[in-house]
């Protein structure tokens, strides 16, 4: 059986996901058989596994850092928010139910079993498991039946490293305060701390570092400077999306929907020197110089269509098309482009039918069956083959489907308008393929100059080197039990 170490944070967005990816790559470079694990994640940015399940995309990146294909055991519980107060519950890759936030607490006691089953399977396969917590163990109001932080660490007997974020300020209180509010037993599970996101000269924090050690009795494992290349890796949270400031070239605008999903579809495009990528947020007007507008995936398609209209983006899109611009809809965004979206069974919310944007002559009916698959598709226009994945509910039909975007196992996918300005597809991840991305950009007279997979590989290596330069990586890995 393998050993394990768990990285928990003093709060959300302290950099846990990135640090786990970096530690995974550092362990792999040491010749260690390593895998990532996150008991519970909350994200609409999901990845498809080879066996038809879905997990958080952060765990897929961590698996990539280990040189592994992602499996459902790496993230056995995935919560996908559908509304402000409810989420879809994915257990070991498959949809279990949808629950309101208050009801999830009642469900949690039944989920520790599957979590431990997945964890133990990984331990039997690999020498080292690097576990990522969620949120913070200082949220002691959630400690009862916890499966994400100390509840899991206690059940699985995994030692913990606590990470604080100095960039947001108050990191001494973050770390010392965490020890103050958790139980002595939980505090005993924590074997040290790490400070992340320091800007400037880390030596300026020497005194603060010693204060934390003296107050907690925990050893420190380093002060990590801000990792400037983090934007080159897929973001887990939509609000963490960073695009390089770039003027000129092909201007692609992505609508930042309220329940945006699989937004990392845009990452490979944003890396291209010949592309200016803009994430359009609530209250902003679609730029008149936009060449292509992307409607991304959504966890609540009808709800996000209402959100889109509330921003006036439906009017902006119509004007954009009149100017000769192009529109690409991905998954939920594809469904929005049609004449109507019917949800008779209330799969994504209250039952009913919503009028679509009407830019494609198609209609969509939501169905209970969810399709999750990693596939190889054939581009209808060029015949080029490319890898992609699907995560969606719904069936789409209509006259414009006679002009498909691609073929999957010989079956048509997507639709293209008669004037070829509007395209929709259920496929995700297609732009990660360098050859296909080059071909797609060429139709807009843009030369592809970046290798996305190579960029991610290089950045993960740089991240591991960054950790090795500023943290006691060998000491951290030696904590594993």
UniProtKB/Swiss-Prot annotation:
NCBIfam families: cobQ, PRK00784.1. It comes from Roseobacter denitrificans (strain ATCC 33942 / OCh 114) (Erythrobacter sp. (strain OCh 114)). GO terms for molecular function: ABC-type vitamin B12 transporter activity; catalytic activity. Belongs to the CobB/CobQ family. CobQ subfamily. HAMAP family: CobQ. It comes from the Bacteria. InterPro entries: Class_I_gatase-like, CobQ/CobB/MinD/ParA_Nub-bd_dom, CobQ_GATase1, CobQ_N, CobQ_synth, GATase_3, P-loop_NTPase. This is Cobyric acid synthase. The active site is at residues 331, 428. SUPFAM superfamilies: Class I glutamine amidotransferase-like (SSF52317), P-loop containing nucleoside triphosphate hydrolases (SSF52540). Keywords: Cobalamin biosynthesis, Glutamine amidotransferase. Disulfide bonds: none annotated. Pathway: Cofactor biosynthesis; adenosylcobalamin biosynthesis. One of its GO terms (biological process) is cobalamin biosynthetic process. Catalyzes amidations at positions B, D, E, and G on adenosylcobyrinic A,C-diamide. NH(2) groups are provided by glutamine, and one molecule of ATP is hydrogenolyzed for each amidation. Residues 249-436 form the GATase cobBQ-type domain. CDD domains: CobQ_N (cd05389), GATase1_CobQ (cd01750).
